[in-house]
Amino acid sequence: MELEYESKRSLYIPYAGPILLEFPLLNKGSAFSIEERNDFNLNGLLPETVESIEEQAERAWRQFQDFKNNNDKHVYLRNIQDTNETLFYRLLDNHLEEMMPIIYTPTVGAACEHFSEIYRRARGLFISYPNRANIEDMLQNATKQNVKVIVVTDGERILGLGDQGIGGMGIPIGKLSLYTACGGISPAYTLPVVLDVGTNNQQLLNDPLYMGWRHPRITGEEYDNFVNEFIQAVKSRWPNVLLQFEDFAQKNAMPLLERYRDEVCCFNDDIQGTAAVTLGTLIAASRAAGGKLCEQKVVFLGAGSAGCGIAEQIIAQMKSEGLSDEEARARVFMVDRFGLLTDRLPNLLNFQSRLVQKSDSLSGWDSANDSLSLLDVVRNAKPDIMIGVSGQPGLFSEEIVREMHKHCTRPIIMPLSNPTSRVEATPQDIMAWTDGCALVATGSPFSPVSWKDKTYPIAQCNNSYIFPGIGLGVIASGASRVTDSMLMAASRALADCSPLVNDGEGPVLPEVNDIQGVSKIIAMAVGKAAQLAGVAVVTSEDVLSKAIAANFWLPQYRNYRRTSI
């Protein structure tokens, strides 16, 4: 993707010498000019040749290619990020498609598992429960003062890998890298945070290299109070910050979102971001298949907070297309490890109970068991769309996929579980079992599939299509909250960008290299929705567009001038 880098005014910098070279946001390395080397006491600290950022990026790209292992590539890129952030993001701009799977899913999963082993340098804030009396001081200690986006995790449900303790910090770091690379939010405005509340991962507790608090996870009132102390401190330190909850366990994710969504500008990417990108993909896929979403039946494998969040967004879209609430809910089937959720099942969570099927409507189903399996649901409900958010590999079996294809000529199948090792079925298998007829979108990146002399691109239904645009839209519009209407606007804007819909061919979602343009379109839709919802000051579309452009940071070096502290 060709990018234009405009020159901007000079920055006045109080740092000099080795201190300046150790400041990742300001370090230029070999690109410091002769004048800057003289002014900032850098003579002798750098090689003679003054390089451009493109020359630096070319060297870094060649070094990157020398690594054969993705985990080593991840460590290498993180090292660049921790020494020269501008170069890091220029490198991503030049090679986003190749590097996104390295800095985030799927490679980030292994980086979280081995966080304490590969640890090189501090980034972000580690807020531990034993140190809870000093939370306000910790926020003051942050190296970035004007924070606009925080991604926070407690490390309990990292991707499909479970409890990783403070190793979960790899997720906020990676996520915020994408806020910048895809959404243009300056790295100077981002802050990753891990809440260290202990870990129940015995392997970590026994690991002599583990750097977190060696204690079983706190729960209940202790946990709730600790999280609340953190959020109140954030409100005091940065009242207008966008706070993204990331990879909290199901038992905490929804309660935290419900408690704080009307108090601070926040959202949960696992619930709302996943729902928004999935809905956008489904709207586009339904259009490509020649119909509307309200005409489809949808079955989910996985009825946790993420799956139920997606289901509620689908129902909201179906209602906007003309269905009643009851009609829309009757078209959505939730299956978990115990089978189809029905009104006869005990001990359902609150967010699950709204998504049950009425037992009376299932009386004519062909099944030998009281518990209705995914195969039973596919055979009897005859869904058009099947979505996997189970975190368990291989559960979309050949029998199930072929059964679905019997009654649906162009099934939409979305195995969304991350990382790749947890996917419910591979695109190659799905295309083989449907004779190339399925529309497939996955949560992790997969190469195009060749089937009978035709190549099918596989859309990656990745939250990175959504959350950077949401963040940019919130910042540009000055939104004080993230509303359901803003998320719905993001989904519809993403659907409008579908190459398959607009061009009649290609993937359901845009190419990764087009993601910055997509983020700007989503930001505009989100900003307008925020104004309509009354959570942002109403402006003209032109003013909002200029605000988006002004807040879109590009990785280019600025000229520096010396000033005193």
From Swiss-Prot:
Name of the featured protein: NAD-dependent malic enzyme
One BP annotation, GO: malate metabolic process
Molecular function terms, GO-annotated: malate dehydrogenase (decarboxylating) (NAD+) activity; metal ion binding; NAD binding; oxaloacetate decarboxylase activity
Assigned GO CC terms: cytosol
NCBIfam families: PRK13529.1
Cofactor note: Divalent metal cations. Prefers magnesium or manganese.
Binding site for a divalent metal cation: E246, D247, D270
Known partners and oligomeric status: Homotetramer.
Catalytic activity entry: (S)-malate + NAD(+) = pyruvate + CO2 + NADH; oxaloacetate + H(+) = pyruvate + CO2
Binding-site list for NAD(+): R157, D270, N418
Gene3D superfamilies, per the entry: Malic enzyme, N-terminal domain, NAD(P)-binding Rossmann-like Domain
Enzyme class at the top of the EC tree: oxidoreductase
Active site, renumbered: Y104 (proton donor), K175 (proton acceptor)
Site feature Important for activity, where: D270
Source organism superkingdom: Bacteria
Protein family according to the UniProt entry: Belongs to the malic enzymes family.
Entry keyword set: Metal-binding, NAD, Oxidoreductase
EC number: 1.1.1.38
Cofactor(s) recorded in Swiss-Prot or TrEMBL: Mg(2+); Mn(2+)
Organism: Erwinia tasmaniensis (strain DSM 17950 / CFBP 7177 / CIP 109463 / NCPPB 4357 / Et1/99)
